[in-house]
Design a protein with these regions (language model features):
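Bacterial Sec-dependent N-terminal signal peptides
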Residues: 1-24, 107-116
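Sequence-level preference for short, compositionally simple segments enriched
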Residues: 24-343
Length: 343
C-alpha cells in the first residue's frame, strides 16, 4: 500500500477510532476516503454515501479530508452504521447556501428533491424544511470532527443540519448558520451532541426530538431565542443542555433560553454557564396559552445570566432529587436501550 494511503489510515485511527486503524480495515473496504483534490476514492461526500450498502450490519467510516465541500447531502433512511469523520473539525466543511425564501429550481440537488420539485410544478418557495445543507434520515449515524454550515444570507430560515433518524451522535462538530441552524425533525428520535459548537440567531435549535447536548458551546449571534422545542405531550424529554457554555456576540444585549414552538415544548439547562445577555425572565411563551403547558426548567447553572429570581412564573427550578434522575441512561432508554458513548 502506498505511503499516502498509509498516512490516511493513521489519521483515521487518530480522529475516528478503530474502524480505519489498519491497512486491512481499509482494504476490506470498510473505510472510504473523500478528498477534493482527488487523492481519495471520491471527490464528494455524496458519492461516498451513495456506494454504501443498504441496512449494513457492520460499521463503515467515511473519512473526509480537509477541504470545503459545497453539496446538499442526504443520508437516506435505508443506510445505517455509518460514521462521517473529518480530518480537521474547522477545515473539513460541508456547506450550502439555500434559505426558505429561494424560488426553487432544483439545480445541483439530489434526485429525490428534484423529483419533489417537478411534482409541484409551479416553482414555489423552498421553505424551511428543504433549506438544509445536510439531512440525516438514517438511524445509527455518527458525525465527528466536521463543520456543517448553511452560509445563506440572512433572508429567511436556513437549516444547516436536519435530522430525521434515531440514535444519531455528533462529536466535536460545528454547526454554523443564522436562523434555524439545527432542526431536530422527528418526534421520538434521540440525538447526542458532545463537545460541539452551535451558533445562530433565531430559534437556532428547534424541533420535536429528544436531544442531549453535553459540553457544547452555544453561541448567540443576535438578540433572539436559542431554542424552539416542539416536544410532543406524550414524550417525557426534549432538549437537555448539560455542562454547556452559552456565549453571545459583543453587540448582543438580550437572549431568551427558549420559547415553545408547540404547546408542550421541553427544554432544560443544567450545570451550564449562562452569560449576562440572558434575559432576567429567561423564557418567552411565544403564545400566552403555552404558559400552561410548556415544560421549561433549570438546575445548578452559573454565570451572570443564571440568576433565577426574576424568571417567569411558569418555568421551574428542579430539585436536586429531580435533577439526579436526568441521566443519559434514563432519558434515552424510554424508547429502547441506547446509551451513546463519545470517544
Amino acid at each position: 500500500m502506498n505511503k499516502l494511503l498509509t498516512t490516511l489510515i493513521a489519521l483515521c485511527s487518530l480522529y475516528c477510532g478503530a474502524a480505519a486503524a489498519t491497512a486491512a480495515n481499509y482494504d476490506n473496504p470498510d473505510t472510504l476516503v473523500v478528498a477534493r483534490d482527488g487523492t481519495g476514492q471520491f471527490r464528494t461526500v455524496t458519492e461516498a454515501v451513495e456506494v454504501c450498502r443498504a441496512f449494513m450490519d457492520y460499521h463503515k467510516v467515511i473519512f473526509i479530508k480537509k477541504g470545503t465541500y459545497k453539496e446538499k447531502l442526504i443520508i437516506p433512511q435505508w443506510l445505517q452504521n455509518i460514521e462521517l469523520c473529518g480530518e480537521d473539525r474547522d477545515l473539513t466543511v460541508i456547506t450550502y447556501d439555500d434559505h426558505a425564501n429561494i424560488t426553487m429550481d432544483g439545480s445541483f440537488w439530489p434526485k429525490e428533491l428534484k423529483d419533489q420539485l417537478l411534482a409541484m410544478g409551479d416553482r414555489p418557495k423552498l421553505g424551511t424544511f428543504r433549506s438544509f445543507t445536510v439531512r440525516i434520515d438514517a438511524n445509527n449515524i455518527t458525525l465527528k470532527n466536521l463543520t456543517i454550515e448553511n452560509n445563506a444570507a440572512r433572508l429567511g430560515q436556513a437549516v444547516a443540519i436536519h435530522t430525521q433518524g434515531d440514535r444519531l451522535t455528533f462529536v466535536n462538530c460545528r454547526f454554523l448558520g443564522h436562523q434555524d441552524t439545527v432542526y431536530t425533525g422527528m418526534p421520538g428520535t434521540r440525538l447526542y451532541f458532545s463537545s460541539c459548537y452551535i451558533e445562530g440567531t433565531t430559534d437556532f435549535i428547534f424541533g420535536p426530538s429528544t436531544a442531549w447536548f453535553e459540553q457544547c458551546v452555544i453561541h448567540c449571534k443576535a438578540n433572539s431565542y436559542i431554542t424552539a422545542a416542539s416536544t410532543p405531550k406524550e414524550i417525557m424529554y426534549g432538549y437537555i443542555f448539560n455542562n454547556c457554555t452559552v456565549t453571545a456576540a459583543a453587540d448582543v444585549e438580550k437572549v431568551y433560553l427558549g420559547r415553545p414552538w408547540r404547546d408542550y415544548g421541553y427544554t432544560l439547562f443544567m450545570n451550564c454557564e449562562l452569560p449576562a445577555q440572558i434575559r432576567p425572565e429567561g423564557w418567552h411563551h411565544w403564545q400566552k396559552e403555552r404558559e400552561q403547558t410548556a415544560r421549561y426548567m433549570e438546575y445548578n447553572n452559573r454565570g451572570p445570566g443564571a440568576a433565577t429570581g426574576q424568571r417567569v412564573g411558569w418555568s421551574r427550578l428542579l430539585s436536586k432529587k429531580e435533577a439526579q434522575q436526568i441521566t443519559l441512561e434514563n432519558v434515552f432508554s424510554l424508547k429502547s436501550e441506547w446509551t451513546p458513548v463519545a470517544p
